[in-house]
């Protein structure tokens, strides 16, 4: 049995989980999310927990078991606590600003790069740290990765956009001038 899939998902107070035929809807204090139902699994809700059990025991079902449990757990965590990713903008003259739902990045190009935030995400700036937050973990991570991709950190000086938890492996420059 899947080690992750067999764990029951605790449903905190104030969170409502509706298991439908096609989708599982989760409503909480921060909003509502939904995740598709896998037809290979059986969803059961009892005494403050949601448990996923496999109908068959083939390879595809085992693969889906842990995945669907994690997706549902992320929905419950999102509507209660929310998720956030912090990005650091490092470099001389590199700046970041948030204007409504548009992030303006000045990261060494001849023009400012504008990134529009999708609905449901919020961005805040403190100094050189940009924080993306929202209730959908997948959307928060995808948006942070898109912003990082605009100017990845380079290994010689470390300039660029990096995750706050990321460490950049630095390289030694050329040792020129020796004859």
From Swiss-Prot:
Q: Which Pfam families does the UniProt record give?
A: Ribosomal_L6
Checking InterPro entries in the record gives: Ribosomal_uL6-like, Ribosomal_uL6-like_a/b-dom_sf, Ribosomal_uL6_a/b-dom, Ribosomal_uL6_bac-type, Ribosomal_uL6_CS
On whether Coiled coil is a keyword of this UniProt record, the answer is no
Biological processes per GO annotation: cytoplasmic translation
SUPFAM superfamilies membership: Ribosomal protein L6 (SSF56053)
Gene Ontology CC annotation, any one: cytosolic large ribosomal subunit
Q: Does the keyword rRNA-binding apply?
A: yes
- What keywords were assigned to this record? Ribonucleoprotein, Ribosomal protein, RNA-binding, rRNA-binding
Q: Which domain of life is it from?
A: Bacteria
* GO terms, molecular function: rRNA binding; structural constituent of ribosome
Q: How does it assemble?
A: Part of the 50S ribosomal subunit.
Q: Explain the purpose of this protein.
A: This protein binds to the 23S rRNA, and is important in its secondary structure. It is located near the subunit interface in the base of the L7/L12 stalk, and near the tRNA binding site of the peptidyltransferase center.
User: What protein family is recorded?
Assistant: Belongs to the universal ribosomal protein uL6 family.
Known HAMAP family for this protein?
Answer: Ribosomal_uL6_B (MF_01365_B)
Q: What is this protein called?
A: Large ribosomal subunit protein uL6
Primary gene name? rplF
